[in-house]
Structures are given as structure tokens and as C-alpha cells.
Amino acid sequence: MPMHPMEKRLHQALFLQSAQRLDQCPPDEGREVAFAGRSNAGKSSAINRLTGQRSLARTSKTPGRTQLLNFFQLDEERRLVDLPGYGYAKVSKSKRNEWQEHLDHYLSERQALVGLVLMMDIRHPLKDFDLMMLEWSAQANMPIHILMTKADKLKFGAAKSTLLQVQKQLKEHPAPLSLQLFSATNGTGCDEAWDKLGEWLGIERLTP
């Protein structure tokens, strides 16, 4: 089977830099797609699977340890951004609030941002963090694509049922929204996710 063009492009992704605040980010130009997810949603694993790189995004035994915005460059005009994870981080409330403020600044003011990929554990969908990101997407009219991660943990029928339930709950979402099943373990949904990333980043899928 021929390699998906986005798989090939993403495999070339290189770590560019980390930033805590908006003014530390790379120049605000080109196109960026950001990846968000609460702790334990499988965000780093999803990024590593989609890029075909085992350790591009750091995975940690302690969820919530990634406290910075991490930028990965595909080329001069295109980047992926790994946003901080939330949920189980063993830090003070004031520190969590500080992270939240920096994330809000990035999401609301970053002109290069063209889409948000939200990782949502299919066994625990629509938690507070997910709802917060959906609300921000609605307010900013920012396209959002949801990966229902860890789909391999459920039988296909149960996974599909959960997907349809979440889809029904979000049908009134005012911003462009799409969702799919995904598994970093067995590769379920990679083609669909690559298609969406290619659309947002302006990389067309070449027909054979």
C-alpha cells in the first residue's frame, strides 16, 4: 500500500522549540495545527503515531508533566503544536491557572493557528477540559477535529456507538467540527486524521 502523502510529510517533522508564553513562540506566520488533550487522553502517543516517530512528542509516566507549548516544524510554512495537557498534574492551583492563561493567549491571539485537534479518550468523553476547548472553538469559530482515542480498548460496536453519541451531543456546535475513531496502538483512523491535517496545512492528497 502506498504511503499517504501526509504520513511522509509528517515523518519529516523536527522539534523546533518550546515556549511558555505567546511572546516566546516562533514568528506568527504560515500555518499551525495544535494538538490538545487532557492528561491520559493519549495525545503524545497520537502525535508520535501520526508522524511515524516514536519519541517526537514526549510521553511521561506522570500525566500532565508537559507544561510548555512544543513546536514541531514540517517546513518553513507549516508547524504542529503540542499544547500542555491538563487533568492530573501534581502542581499548585496557581500554577495550573498560569498554564491556562498562557494557553488562552495562544489560542485567542495566534494568527497562524488554522485548526485544533482534540484528543478525547473514548472511554471518558466530554470531560471539563474537552468542554472548555469546545467552548473556545465555538467562540473563535476555529475548526476542531476530535480524535476519539484508545478506540482499540472497546469492541468496534461499542466504539462506534460512543462516537455517534458524542456526535449527536455536539451537532449544534457552531464552528466547523468533525470527529473520528482513533488508536495509536493499531493505527485505526490514521488515514482520516492525515486527510484532515493535509486539508488544514494546505497539503493536497495526491491521487494515484
Curated annotation (Swiss-Prot):
Role description: Necessary for normal cell division and for the maintenance of normal septation.
Gene Ontology CC terms: cytosol
Record's protein name: Probable GTP-binding protein EngB
Boundaries of every EngB-type G domain copy: 29-203
One Pfam match: MMR_HSR1
Highest taxon of source: Bacteria
Record's keyword annotation contains GTP-binding: yes
Annotated GO biological process: division septum assembly
Family affiliation: Belongs to the TRAFAC class TrmE-Era-EngA-EngB-Septin-like GTPase superfamily. EngB GTPase family.
Positions bound to GTP: 37-44, 64-68, 82-85, 149-152, 182-184
Keyword Nucleotide-binding: yes
Cofactor entry: Mg(2+)
Binding site for Mg(2+): 44, 66
UniProt keyword annotations, A-Z: Cell cycle, Cell division, GTP-binding, Magnesium, Metal-binding, Nucleotide-binding, Septation
A GO molecular-function descriptor: GTP binding
